[in-house]
């Protein structure tokens, strides 16, 4: 669920995000400043709000830290892999001629990798921690950060040929599928976070307990919640070590 506490994984992710960006301030593309003045102010506001929220949220919730491996750990693995790809993107940029085309190019087939990779990584970290606050903050950041990068990319590659109709249809369908899948995950996590918070607020004598028990030789995840600790209700139990938390 949601647990307050220091997140060392959050700190690691922030360091992986900030260190190359700090180095980049000394290696900006020579024409970068002329593009900055054209940035959409609304997108810039979303970007700044998202950055502030993420920097705080990933450090104050311990749900992002390592815990007993289970199927849900795949989200953390994916998040780490995306951040490693992000570092790879920066290594390629620093070894290039450091032009605007290098800065806004794709990496491993991922468009505007400098923006999309960290946004996706923090979103997956939010799923791993089952933390709606980080998911929401990442969406806000993504709207601004990826939006700004996409607009700059169009300016930089202004001579790029338009893609065919089939390519554009596939792109729309693919994006729509991603929105539906990850939007659904976000809603489910948000609903569970809301129920947990509401239970803590409305019941000082309540109970909120989760863990793993051995049943018939198989480790199973359980969740117990109730407004009265003397009369709790088991609301989640299933076979295998996997947990949506």
Feature names for model-found ranges:
Residues 22-39:
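Membrane-interface helix-loop junction between the first two transmembrane segments
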Residues 49-77:
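Membrane-helix boundary elements
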Residues 68-120:
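Membrane-proximal helix-loop-helix units in multi-pass membrane proteins
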Residues 102, 119-135:
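Membrane-helix boundary connector in multi-pass membrane proteins
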Residues 231, 240-245:
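Short substrate-entry loop that stabilizes the transition state in hydrolases
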Residues 234-235:
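Hydrophobic beta-strand anchors of alpha/beta hydrolase catalytic cores
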């Amino acid at each position: 669920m949601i647990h307050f506490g220091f997140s060392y994984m959050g700190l690691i992710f922030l360091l992986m995000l900030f260190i190359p960006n700090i180095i980049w301030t000394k290696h900006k593309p020579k024409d970068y400043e002329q593009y900055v003045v054209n940035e959409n102010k609304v997108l810039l506001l979303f970007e700044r709000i998202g950055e502030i929220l993420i920097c705080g949220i990933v450090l104050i919730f311990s749900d992002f830290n390592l815990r007993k491996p289970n199927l849900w750990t795949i989200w953390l693995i994916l998040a780490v892999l995306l951040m490693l790809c992000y570092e790879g993107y920066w290594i390629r940029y620093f070894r290039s001629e450091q032009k605007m085309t290098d800065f806004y190019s794709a990496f491993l087939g991922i468009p505007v990798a400098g923006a999309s990779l960290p946004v996706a990584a923090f979103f997956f970290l939010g799923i791993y921690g089952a933390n709606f606050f980080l998911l929401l903050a990442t969406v806000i950041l993504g709207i601004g950060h990826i939006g700004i990068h996409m607009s700059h990319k169009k300016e930089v590659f202004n001579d790029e040929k338009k893609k065919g109709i089939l390519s554009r249809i596939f792109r729309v369908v693919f994006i729509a599928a991603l929105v539906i899948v990850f939007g659904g995950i976000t809603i489910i996590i948000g609903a569970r976070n809301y129920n947990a918070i509401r239970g803590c607020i409305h019941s000082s004598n309540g109970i909120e307990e989760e863990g793993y028990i051995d049943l018939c030789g198989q480790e199973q995840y359980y969740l117990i919640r109730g407004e009265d600790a003397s009369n709790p209700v088991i609301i989640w139990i299933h076979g295998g070590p996997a947990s949506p938390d």
